[in-house]
Amino acid sequence: MKFEYPLIPATLLRRYKRFLADVELSDGSTITVHCPNTGSMRNCIVENSPCWLLDSANPKRKYRYSLERVTTPTGAVAGINSASANGLVIAAIENGVISELQGYDELAREQRYGDEKSRIDILLSKPEEQCYIEVKSVTLEEGKGEGFFPDAVSTRGQKHLRELMAMRSQGHRAVLFFCVQHSGITKVAAAEHIDPAYAALFKQAVNEGVEVIAYGVDLGIEGSVITKKLKVV
């Protein structure tokens, strides 16, 4: 996924009210930008650290710039725009990067499914087979190279695991896809120490045939692209 304009370097001063952050630009001026991540962003926010902004090029927008990348406590770079994960995975599927998800005829987004009235992120289909894919953006690193999801208790994430298990029980292929937007993470696990209920459902889902796939993202100044498979533990 290529940005319309290259990212702009800045210094992160603080994040507040979940959706806002104050940053200092290279000319010394301070502006408020939109933070496109509603999660805890645990281990991602370091005050007075380098960050990168995306310019919407829309002067009428209340917050013209969005916080796209941050520097973590370990010095790694994290892409904190969780909404971009679906697009990254779709592009990687279409470009043949994700070998596990090739061979389908159609790709649909945000289709309604399941008893809990969810929307599947990606639905792949071919004659006599459907593949339901839930995409999760991973940015939490704890320990050297160890990535975890979720970074806070996630009842929504728990619901998605139940829905995937239901699809698998009906004979469909079901996939949980971890899109790792963090340059320091080399392996991913369910965060039992943060959300024990999610971790228990994760183990149950794996035992019932839900596939778990993790890939890392190359976080460039001009765009992002999924590049390599990572280990799930």
UniProtKB/Swiss-Prot annotation:
Taxonomic lineage of the native organism: Bacteria, Pseudomonadati, Pseudomonadota, Gammaproteobacteria, Cellvibrionales
Record family assignment: Belongs to the SfsA family.
Domain of life according to the entry: Bacteria
Gene Ontology terms for molecular function: DNA binding
InterPro entries: SfsA (IPR005224), SfsA_C (IPR040452), SfsA_N (IPR041465)
Cross-referenced HAMAP family: SfsA
The species this protein was found in: Saccharophagus degradans (strain 2-40 / ATCC 43961 / DSM 17024)
Name of the protein described by the UniProt record: Sugar fermentation stimulation protein homolog
UniProt cross-references to CDD domains, sorted A to Z: SfsA-like_bacterial
